[in-house]
């Protein structure tokens, strides 16, 4: 039968069943993979469903439970939920916009309500009516649902910000009566958070995740950063941008000016008067950061191009190379490998892969890198020859993958973020495979570069 028929019959069967029997939630213990497989067998495959569409993309991966995909159609796009075997559990109506990954039996829609596996819209029972959902994501501290509500009294208005864990217990809570919020207007904070733009990672975003256990609130020109593990807060007024990246218990500030911070958000003294020679934003990854900086103080000091730790100790010297960003993405380590885009003295582009010990995993070769994707053991690098649409894909050793000729990743150029970064991850490494969008299909890719399409 064609995909349409089998799908609609599966939909009819599914609608007659209670939700529990139709699905196995990730939290229940599955005795065996066969049991899960048989429970999912009633669902149509992504390949069957995608036949009626022009293509499919991975939007919010969570292969452990269900992933959010996007089906592209002439009459509009539709979100869907599918499992690791590529079976489609639900296709949403075209007017439903999914704005988070699917965790613990639910995902968030753009109208600030949650959707179940069968598409039912609901609000978690532990939320009072005046709580507005502002973020739902799986971050380093686990899956958290963030809300804001306001309390008005004759003394004044306050906004209360709460993070709920998957049991509906309060994991973290604070309100705008804290000193750090004293320069902000509580009414404005509430309105900014209630209208938070959930899927952008822009400077003006009212509520943002910075990595690690650090979150940020922005209102007017004030920022409040909070570490929900240490319960430490930090506030600052900055008319431009104030950006912090956290990795584990390490933090760097990338704007205004480059600094490393301690657990209390104090600047580390060794970063005093440091100025970058590059316009791109560096990235702290696997404890190292690529820098080309100088100290503009009485004792002028040079920190040439290379990888450094957060105390400005140079780990790898790259000063003999002309290091380029990859579409504004600076070099970073992924699985112990850093992909470097370089130019020779005549301006010809070369790329190579360096290991943490500073030796080459892949010697420099000609080409311009377009994509870098994480695999279970290394990275995949897609290059494109200048002026001709000829795509090549390599592993971290520089070995060309012949079966990848003329196919490429979908999405914007640069480094693909694993979904664990809390941002809109466009790939996920799960059980030894990378799941990503490839040539308008959802693909399952192994570390050796072999792949299969799920859609």
Which residues fall in each region the model found?
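Gram-positive cell-envelope targeting signals
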Residues: 1-27, 31-34, 38
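Residue-level detector of conserved, function-critical positions
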Residues: 37-455
């Amino acid at each position: 039968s064609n995909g349409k028929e089998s799908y609609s019959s599966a939909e009819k069967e599914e609608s007659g069943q209670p939700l529990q029997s139709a699905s196995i939630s990730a939290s229940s213990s599955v005795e065996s993979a066969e049991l899960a497989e048989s429970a999912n067998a009633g669902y149509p495959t992504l390949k069957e469903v995608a036949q009626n569409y022009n293509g499919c993309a991975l939007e919010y991966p969570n292969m452990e439970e269900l992933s959010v995909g996007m089906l592209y159609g002439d009459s509009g796009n539709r979100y869907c939920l599918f499992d690791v075997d590529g079976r489609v559990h639900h296709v949403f109506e075209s007017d439903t916009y999914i704005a988070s990954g699917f965790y613990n039996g639910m995902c968030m829609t753009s109208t600030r309500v949650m959707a179940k596996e069968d598409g039912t819209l609901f609000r978690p029972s532990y939320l009072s009516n005046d709580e507005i959902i502002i973020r739902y994501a799986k971050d380093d501290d686990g899956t958290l649902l963030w809300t804001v509500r306001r309390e008005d009294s004759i003394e004044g208005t306050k906004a209360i910000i709460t993070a709920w864990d998957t049991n509906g217990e309060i994991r973290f809570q604070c309100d705008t009566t804290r000193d750090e919020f004293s320069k902000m207007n509580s009414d404005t904070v509430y309105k900014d958070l209630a209208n938070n733009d959930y899927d952008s990672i822009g400077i003006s975003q009212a509520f943002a995740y910075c990595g690690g256990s650090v979150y940020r609130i922005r209102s007017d020109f004030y920022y409040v950063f909070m570490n929900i593990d240490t319960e430490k807060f930090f506030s600052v007024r900055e008319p431009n941008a104030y950006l912090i990246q956290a990795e584990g218990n390490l933090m760097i500030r990338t704007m205004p000016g480059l600094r490393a911070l301690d657990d209390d958000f104090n600047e580390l003294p060794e970063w005093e008067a440091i100025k970058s020679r590059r316009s791109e934003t560096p990235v702290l990854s696997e404890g190292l950061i690529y820098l080309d900086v100088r100290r503009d103080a009485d004792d002028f000091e040079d920190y040439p191009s290379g990888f450094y730790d957060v105390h400005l100790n140079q780990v790898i010297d790259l000063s003999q190379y002309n290091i380029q960003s990859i579409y504004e993405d600076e070099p970073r380590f992924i699985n112990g490998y850093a992909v470097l885009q370089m130019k020779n003295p005549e301006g010809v582009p070369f790329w190579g892969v360096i290991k943490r010990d500073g030796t080459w995993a892949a010697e420099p070769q000609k080409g311009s890198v377009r994509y870098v994707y994480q695999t279970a053991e290394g990275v995949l690098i897609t290059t494109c020859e200048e002026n001709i649409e000829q795509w090549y894909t390599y592993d971290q050793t520089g070995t060309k993958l012949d079966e990848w000729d003329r196919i490429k990743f979908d999405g914007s150029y640069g480094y693909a973020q694993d979904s664990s970064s809390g941002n809109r991850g466009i790939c996920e490494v799960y059980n030894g495979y990378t799941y990503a969008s490839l040539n308008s299909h959802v693909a399952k890719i192994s570390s050796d570069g072999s792949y299969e399409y799920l859609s």
